[in-house]
């Protein structure tokens, strides 16, 4: 089965230039398809109770939900950003979910706020982040989310400065 998300990124990489092209090319380099499982398969009933209480899972709040889950279990859970297909429509949107115990991906927002079967959606992960990284980016940006975009912007600035230094040496 083809991945519509990555096909879209490939297309955007061909029609853009400069920073945008570099962004899509980097996304394609970092991208890996993943499969989510039900949170019930990973967490105990007691842990799920704590999750529902602490995370306050709501529609359109995936970044906050994933951030809170990573903070609730910092030794077990990482925050993941990428894209996922919108249930019932099949096109990708920027999204956040979690990696548990280094091997199980869970999407509390799709599973509990949207009541979707997470095993049937396409997911493309860009990177998994520990709580120190997501806290730092959230404090800097004053919002949840856009960790990948923020770190890419930092990388792009450093890369541009490095190229400028190298050109000045010539």
Map each language-model feature to its residues.
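A structural boundary/capping signal
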Residues: 1-170
């Amino acid at each position: 089965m083809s991945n519509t998300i990555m096909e879209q990124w490939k297309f955007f990489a061909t029609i853009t230039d400069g920073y945008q092209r570099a962004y899509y090319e980097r996304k394609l380099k970092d991208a890996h398809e993943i499969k989510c499982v039900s949170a019930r398969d990973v967490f105990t009933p007691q842990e799920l109770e704590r999750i529902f209480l602490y995370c306050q899972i709501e529609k359109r709040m995936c970044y906050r939900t994933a951030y809170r889950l990573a903070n609730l279990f910092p030794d077990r859970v990482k925050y993941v950003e990428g894209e996922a297909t919108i249930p019932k429509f099949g096109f990708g949107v920027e999204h956040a979910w979690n990696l548990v115990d280094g091997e199980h991906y869970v999407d509390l927002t799709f599973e509990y706020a949207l009541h979707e079967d997470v095993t049937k959606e396409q997911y493309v992960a860009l990177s998994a982040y520990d709580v120190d990284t997501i806290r730092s980016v959230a404090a800097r940006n004053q919002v949840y989310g856009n960790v990948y975009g923020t770190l890419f912007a930092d990388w792009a600035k450093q890369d541009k400065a490095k190229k400028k230094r190298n050109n000045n040496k010539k």
